[in-house]
Amino acid sequence: MVEEKKEELVGKITHYFGKIEVGIVEITKGSLTVGDTIHIKGSATDFEQSVDSMQIEHQQVEKVKKGDVIGLKVKEKVKEGDEVYKIVE
């Protein structure tokens, strides 16, 4: 039997820099750590990826929490308003 993955909403995309493939994420709930798996969903967006790189004010960070606004390296194009979910095993 396939177990469905549990997802927790952690934030939303507020901006996207296409040239450098970075989405700006406002963390609205919970936390994210480098190595976590996330699912980004929106009207034209739906993909999963591992969190490989996060920055706050151009400084590399390992963990972020509610209230932080971060730059997140993304593997596909994202749009403002897309929701970011952390996949919980």
Locate each region found by the language model.
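Beta-strand/loop-dominated core regions that host nucleotide or nucleotide-derived cofactor-binding catalytic loops
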Residues: V2-L32, D36-E89
